Amino acid sequence: MTIDAQKYDKIARTVFAPVFPLIADQIIAYTGVTQGTCLDIGCGGGYLGAALADKTDLFVRFFDASPDMLEITRRTIAENELTERADTLQGNVTAIPLPDASVDLAVSRGSIFFWEDLPRALTDIHRVLTPDGWAYIGGGFGSKAITESIVSEMKKRNQGSDEFRDRVRRNLGPESRERFETALKTAGLDRASILHDEEIGLWIIIRK
């Protein structure tokens, strides 16, 4: 699926702005990972990775299939003065161009819903995790209140259409959870679980 990088980024930088620091806090609280290498998969403009870098000592590797998105990410890196603590990497999540056991924390928000071969992607994410590594991958907006606020704003921007609300419900609903559970079983990832509620959204947790 082709995404208009500039259009997507405009929304991410404005409407979605409150989401990233809150999710970063939730990731840190759940995993306890604050040092080492973080891989932000399907990073878009890099806002989740930047929020994690701001709150930790992590080196963040921003990973996306889109060169246009990575151009935006490089701007985010510069704006947040992260040039010594970050880099960018282009590629596909089913064949991450990194060595085995090289990532302490893999994160991804929103990208997973575009992954066509989910079991293969999860398998490769597991491959790059260090022996004590974590992956925190899925979708959400940090809280129910923020979700409702964003849905309302997007409805205004879409001339009253509920298309965005419907997509959120679909992505964070039971069908997506079932798809995630099936993919984890297919991938044979025993040390994995799913977090799912209306506050935090829908997330896959993987331990090495």
Residue ranges, per PLM feature:
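Conserved class I S-adenosyl-L-methionine
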Residues: 1-34, 47-51, 163, 198-200
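C-terminal alpha-helical "lid/dimerization" subdomain adjacent to the S-adenosyl-L-methionine
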Residues: 11-16, 138-197, 201
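Short glycine-centered segments of the SAM/dcSAM-binding site in methyltransferase folds
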Residues: 37, 132-134
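Class I SAM-dependent methyltransferase SAM/SAH-binding core
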Residues: 37-95
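A short acidic, Gly/Pro-enriched loop at the edge of an enzyme's catalytic core
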Residues: 94-105
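A short SAM/SAH-binding and catalytic strip from SAM-dependent methyltransferases
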Residues: 105-118
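A short glycine-rich, Lys/Arg-flanked "PGG" loop and its adjoining helix->strand segment in the class I
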Residues: 119-131
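C-terminal lobe and adjacent flexible extensions of AdoMet/dcAdoMet transferase-like proteins
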Residues: 203-208
